[in-house]
Design a protein with these regions (language model features):
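Short, aromatic-enriched amphipathic alpha-helices that serve as compact interaction elements
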Residues: 34-53, 60
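A beta-strand edge to alpha-helix "cap/lid" segment located at domain peripheries
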Residues: 15-16, 84-176
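A solvent-exposed, acidic/Ser-Thr-rich amphipathic alpha-helical stretch
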Residues: 40, 55-59, 63-109
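N-terminal secretory signal peptides
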Residues: 1-8, 16-23
Length: 176
């Protein structure tokens, strides 16, 4: 399979997965009657990260968390100690974080979100990475965290590429 077809196929699979999750959510869960504990937990994680507080992030994950934060090009981070090590490596590089969510839908034990990981590095780079994510809960804690994003955009932004008009449009929506 040639590269453009592989990329198109991968994006189609990710989009189909998102549609399947949205379609499977009952009106009670996806609508106004749902419990917001999962969304509130994610907002607390985001607030912790905005404050460069690794322990505040980790307070909302299980000890055996599985964190797939590279869209599959690196192995999953497994366990709270390993996640702490990764976050402690990332935190000193980031000057300011504007990570946010635009849309979310819940099922019984998971929440599917669309958002943007936007941040400014201490070296002055402005990075914008649109993403979709799935967070699986065990009780009130996240036990699995999967992120899906275009690694090409991530690499180009980290190498200094400017924010495109398309990215500006994608991230200009109000956050939840």
């Amino acid at each position: 399979m040639n590269q453009p077809m592989a990329l198109t196929t991968r994006r189609s699979v990710i989009a189909a997965a998102g549609v399947a999750i949205l379609a499977s959510a009952s009106p009670t869960i996806a609508g106004k009657n749902r419990s917001d504990h999962m969304l509130e937990t994610l907002k607390a994680i985001i607030t912790g990260w905005h404050n460069h507080d690794v322990e505040a992030v980790l307070a909302h994950v299980t000890d055996d968390i599985v964190w797939r934060n590279t869209s599959g090009y690196r192995p999953a981070v497994k366990g709270k100690a390993a996640m702490r090590a990764v976050l402690e490596t990332m935190a000193p590089v980031i000057e300011t974080s504007a990570w946010r969510m635009f849309d979310a839908v819940e099922t019984q034990d998971r929440i599917f979100v669309e958002g943007v990981d936007e941040f400014w590095t201490k070296s002055g780079r402005h990075i914008v990475i649109p993403y979709a994510g799935v967070f699986v809960f065990r009780g009130k804690l996240v036990s699995e965290w999967r992120e899906y994003f275009d690694g090409r955009i991530s690499s180009e932004m980290k190498d200094g590429a400017p924010i495109t008009d398309e990215l500006k449009e994608m991230i200009s929506r109000p956050s939840i």
